[in-house]
């Protein structure tokens, strides 16, 4: 089988990775995608490195059974913590959220990063961004309320606004004007963030990731031409993927297959 005709696996703990999937579909219309929302284990942000590795390993093996030419970690937590380890274990192209941002984001004096607790605790996101010498200060803000709210379908209203004010308070004190959405769930909240803080520039790394995926596929002569299909999988509840995912992609996700990763964390 021609390797270029194989699909691309993309995963997240839930519906968040759909924000990356949309950019990939727009830039790579000739590709087939397999999207996995690991909803049985959401949120990833409160999990240990060991738990994330067990899940990541099982997900890569699932994609390899399907037959893929590349796996996209559409999850900042997994990108920072497990991708560096898993790419040494498996002979398949991999791309995450952090490196494309690091390479492509323009220089800023100060930048804030909204992220999960696990991403913030790892210290890797801040370290990688500071290594570029593009930023004088990188402020990491853990946002534990965001993912559970989004997975329930709550992307606006009082709860979201209260959480957003709490998370932005330290950034405003430091006069930060550029804020990275360091979790793929967070673009669902862009409207609320911009309503509350219209002078803040919100940076979504998804477009950087899509461009990097395109570059790697082209470099390896793996660009597909006859695709255009997306298959959706979940490990638990499918509601958020069907509802919010459909809204974000602009079409109905009517078929979602439930799978068992056969792991205990």
From Swiss-Prot:
Which residues does UniProt mark as catalytic? 75 (proton donor/acceptor), 183 (proton donor/acceptor)
The pathway is: Cell wall biogenesis; peptidoglycan biosynthesis
- Is Cell inner membrane found in the keyword set? no
Spell out the PROSITE patterns in the cross-references: ASP_GLU_RACEMASE_2
Q: Which reaction does it catalyse?
A: L-glutamate = D-glutamate
Q: In the Enzyme Commission scheme, what number(s) does this protein have?
A: 5.1.1.3
| NCBIfam families referenced in this protein's UniProt entry, alphabetically | glut_race
Q: What is this protein called?
A: Glutamate racemase
The species this protein was found in: Carboxydothermus hydrogenoformans (strain ATCC BAA-161 / DSM 6008 / Z-2901)
């Amino acid at each position: 089988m021609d390797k270029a005709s194989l699909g691309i696996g993309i995963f997240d703990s839930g519906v968040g990775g759909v924000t990356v999937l949309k950019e990939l579909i727009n830039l790579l219309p000739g590709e087939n995608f397999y999207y996995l929302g690991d909803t049985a284990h959401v949120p990833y942000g409160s999990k240990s490195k060991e738990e994330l590795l067990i899940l990541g390993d099982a997900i890569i093996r699932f994609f390899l059974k399907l037959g893929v030419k590349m796996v996209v970690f559409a999850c900042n937590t997994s990108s920072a913590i497990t991708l560096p380890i898993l790419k040494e274990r498996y002979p398949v192209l991999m791309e995450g959220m952090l490196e494309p941002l690091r390479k492509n984001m323009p220089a800023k004096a100060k930048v804030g990063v909204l992220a999960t607790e696990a991403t913030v605790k790892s210290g890797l996101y801040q370290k990688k961004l500071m290594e570029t010498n593009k930023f004088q200060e990188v402020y990491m803000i853990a946002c534990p309320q965001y993912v559970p709210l989004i997975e329930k379908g709550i992307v606006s209203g009082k709860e979201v606004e209260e959480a957003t004010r709490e998370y932005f308070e330290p950034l405003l004190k430091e006069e930060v004007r550029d804020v990275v959405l360091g979790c793929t769930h967070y673009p669902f909240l862009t409207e609320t963030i911009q309503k509350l803080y219209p002078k803040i520039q919100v940076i979504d790394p998804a477009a950087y990731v899509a461009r990097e995926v395109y570059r790697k596929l082209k470099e390896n002569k793996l660009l597909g031409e006859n695709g255009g299909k997306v298959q959706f999988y979940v490990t638990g509840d499918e509601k958020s993927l069907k509802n919010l995912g459909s809204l974000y992609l602009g079409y109905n996700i009517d078929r979602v297959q439930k799978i068992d990763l056969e792991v205990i964390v």
